[in-house]
Structures are given as C-alpha cells and as structure tokens.
Amino acid sequence: MTENIHKHRILILDFGSQYTQLVARRVRELGVYCELWAWDVTEAQIRDFNPSGIILSGGPESTTEENSPRAPQYVFEAGVPVFGVCYGMQTMAMQLGGHVEGSNEREFGYAQVEVLTDSALVRGIEDSLTADGKPLLDVWMSHGDKVTAIPSDFVAVASTESCPFAIMANEEKRFYGVQFHPEVTHTRQGMRMLERFVRDICQCEALWTPAKIIDDAVARIREQVGDDKVILGLSGGVDSSVTAMLLHRAIGKNLTCVFVDNGLLRLNEAEQVMDMFGDHFGLNIVHVPAEERFLSALAGENDPEAKRKIIGRVFVEVFDEEALKLEDVKWLAQGTIYPDVIESAASATGKAHVIKSHHNVGGLPKEMKMGLVEPLKELFKDEVRKIGLELGLPYDMLYRHPFPGPGLGVRVLGEVKKEYCDLLRRADAIFIEELRKADLYDKVSQAFTVFLPVRSVGVMGDGRKYDWVVSLRAVETIDFMTAHWAHLPYDFLGRVSNRIINEVNGISRVVYDISGKPPATIEWE
C-alpha cells in the first residue's frame, strides 16, 4: 500500500488574482497537496474535498460592490482554519461583520507592517525591529479597498501607516487575514507565514514530495490500466517525457511511445530523443519520420494561425495511423498538467474549477475507443521537473527553455521550407551553445533564433553575397505574461553573430530583437 499523499490537503478558493496559482505552488513547495477551485463552490463540494484548511485568494474586484464575489458561508462554519489574502481578507471581514471601504489612495508596492500583538501566524517572524522593539515585516501590497472595522471577535495583529488592519486574527477559530501578498517573493517572510498556517495551524504533514508523488502515480496508473496496453505521443518535451518515464515505471513494455519527427525540431533533437528513451532508458518507442509530409502540407502557407492548425492536423493524422497499427491498445496517455486543467475550466466557465479530465486529444479516429491516462494532471510545471529529476531524466533536458508546440513552424516567418528550417536549426544551435558557454543560458528565461524571409547583402572575402537574415531573441520573465528583452553583453552578441555568419552558409545578417512584452509577444508568430 502506498501512503495517502492527499490525506492532508488545502483548498484555495480563487477570486481572480494574478497570483492565485502562485499561492498553490507555494503550498505544494511546503510538501502539502492543495487544489484551486472557483470561489462559488457548494457546501457539498467543500465537505467532499474535506480540507485541512482553506485559503481565500486575492482578486481584482471591490468587496464594496453589490455583486462582488463572496466566499461560501460554509467556509466559516467548517471548523477548519481559514487564511484570507488581500481580497480574501476583505470578504472575510465583511461576511463576519466587519466593514470595508474604498481607499483614497491605492497601496501598491513595498510596505512595512508593524506587528502590534502576538499571533500564531507571525510569532517569531520579523524582518527588523522598531526603536521600541516591535517586529516589522517587509511586505508587498496591492490593493485599493481596505478593512476599516474588523469583526468583533477578531484582533488587529499588525498595521501600516495607511492601513490600520494589515493583519487580523481570530485565534480561537483559527481565522487569519492579511492585506498583503505572502505568496510573492517581495514579501520576504511570506513563505514562513504560509508555512506557519499550513504546517502548524492546519497541522498538515509534508507528504507531497517527489518520491512519494512518483509512488502514488505508479500505483494509480497500475490500478487504472491493469494489464492493458497504453499509447503515448512522445515529443521530447518535459511533460510528455516525464509522462513516458512514469508509465514505463508502472507498466513497462505495455507502453508504446510514438515519436513523430515532423522536421520542425531543433538540431539533432530526433536522434537525442531516440537515443535517450529508446537506447538509454529502454522504452518501447516507434520513430515516425514525417518531415516531407508536414512540409508539403505547409507549402505555400504564410498565415501563422493556419500553419499551427496544419501542423496540429497532420500530427493527429500521423499519430492516428500509427495507433491503428498497434493491436489491443486500450488507453491514450497525455502529458496534461494542472495549469492546463485550470485553464480549460476557466475558458469554459470563466473561472477555475475542480480537477476534471482535460480532453485535448484532437481527432482520434471514431473506431478507437480509448480511455485517457493523465498522470501529471495534478502537478504544476516545477513539480513535473522535480519528478523528472527523481526519475533520472537529465537536468539540461528538464530545464530547457520553452519550445512551441508547432516548433520551427512558427519560428520560420511566413512559408516554411526545408532550406529555411535547416539554416535556422544551425543558427539557433550556435546561439544556445554560446549562451551555455558564457553561463548565460540559465540567466535568461527563454532564448531562440527566428528566420526572417528577407535577403540582405553581405560581403564574404572578395565577393558579395545576398543571403538570409536571422533575429536572435532572449527575454527575462517570471510568468511569461510580461517580459523584458535580455540585455546580453555586446561582445557576446558580436561573437554569436560572427559564428553564425561564418559557419552557416546562407545567412548574411544577424539582428537582435529588443522588444518587450507588451507590446510585442515573446514568439514572433
């Protein structure tokens, strides 16, 4: 019997903050399972989930508006600790008899919170002390409204100059509210506060660890599929690779991986995937060379969205044909991760919901009635990587920069041709190799090369050449929602440019993209 790693669990109710997924990731980092649900869940759903504690997230609305979101009243009757963050604190205060008002000044950015009285939430936690010995906390504020009167059975634990109730608490009921964001790194002791709430106040054990997650996933896969055969589309990306390794550990040769080589991958990537998963790890893997098929389908197409659809359609066609060749396959495995589940629920309903199967299968043939196996669907990306390391996958592969699903199909601008892909592959490999050599690869969030269908005059020796242009792109970002262009050293950029122009016959000019997001997107197409 594997240990029940879901035994202690935190429920996070999402009021729409951009930081809500970060709250969930922080709780997971503390070794405790949690789920993210929409704020309007029913009492029955909460009872069924049986949380050890509940966190109410921040949100963009104003609690003073008539129809603004409210926590289900049962949250405060369930007999478990509750932690309100920003909007979550405000709705807690209002629903329990306090008062919230719109503030004249919006408080955004760093603030110092002075701790006024003892509380289990912040006992022994401080960044500095006032002249008379009171603890101070450096926190990150982002709010317009503020609590102006707390419920009668609460106490004011901490304040700022403009916010009289920066922390409030009812120690007996174990209800806590903070007007700042403990989940962001700018709140220096935020992780300790979350740990205090989750581990001490809610008394959750650290059961959610990579090794235990693997044991649990393997047991669940075996229970779900038994002795049946499973098929997986393996791309060589993080999610499908970790899915393959988990399934291989659980069911061995009953897993068949199909690797579709679409001709739009990075330099030597197909060989690396086959070497690692076939030769090194011994997975049962079918290599399908399909470059000509993809490129002929893309011929003459310039529109980025149309290119994406063509690549997706042809992949499904090729994968289906291979699946039909295999006998007795009952299950399709997918590398769906928790943010996919949250996003698909949000796109359907406008908000996060309970974990459900995330059917992104596309167009499996009608005659193939397969069940779906999604061993990563409870996991965030950082957890998937940690599990991959535990399963023996190489660090460089797991922590590689993001690569788009359509691959070079959206990094060759306009029509995709084999000549362009070959040039781009070689130029990009030089850029990435130099980033690694200069110890810059892990200092940027994403770096890649784009092929521009533009010819430019160059000089090589005594002759002129009229060849293609590529653009280098490197960005720094935390969440990929916004990004700054990376200020790479000029001598480094010069070295990369010289190598590409000298070593890749067919490229005469290299430019560097200095656009932020917004207004530009990270990828060009």
Swiss-Prot record:
GMPS ATP-PPase domain span: 208-400
NCBIfam families in the record: guaA_Cterm, guaA_Nterm, PRK00074.1
Entry keyword annotation includes Glycoprotein: no
Signal peptide: none
Name of the gene this protein is made from: guaA
EC number annotated for this UniProt entry: 6.3.5.2
Catalytic activity, reaction form: XMP + L-glutamine + ATP + H2O = GMP + L-glutamate + AMP + diphosphate + 2 H(+)
Assembly information from the UniProt record: Homodimer.
Gene3D superfamilies xrefs: 3.30.300.10, 3.40.50.880, HUPs
Cross-referenced InterPro entries: Class_I_gatase-like, GATASE, GMP_synth_C, GMP_synth_GATase, GMP_synthase, GMPS_ATP_PPase_dom, NAD/GMP_synthase, Rossmann-like_a/b/a_fold
Protein name as it appears in the record: GMP synthase [glutamine-hydrolyzing]
Pathway: Purine metabolism; GMP biosynthesis; GMP from XMP (L-Gln route): step 1/1
Function: Catalyzes the synthesis of GMP from XMP.
One GO cellular component term: cytosol
Domain Glutamine amidotransferase type-1: 9-207
Amino-acid positions noted as binding ATP in the UniProt annotation, renumbered to this chain: 235-241
A Pfam family hit: GATase
Active-site residues, record numbering mapped to chain: 86 (nucleophile), 181, 183
One Gene Ontology molecular-function label: GMP synthase activity
Alphabetical keyword list: ATP-binding, Glutamine amidotransferase, GMP biosynthesis, Ligase, Nucleotide-binding, Purine biosynthesis
Stored PANTHER family: GMP SYNTHASE [GLUTAMINE-HYDROLYZING] (PTHR11922:SF2), GMP SYNTHASE-RELATED (PTHR11922)
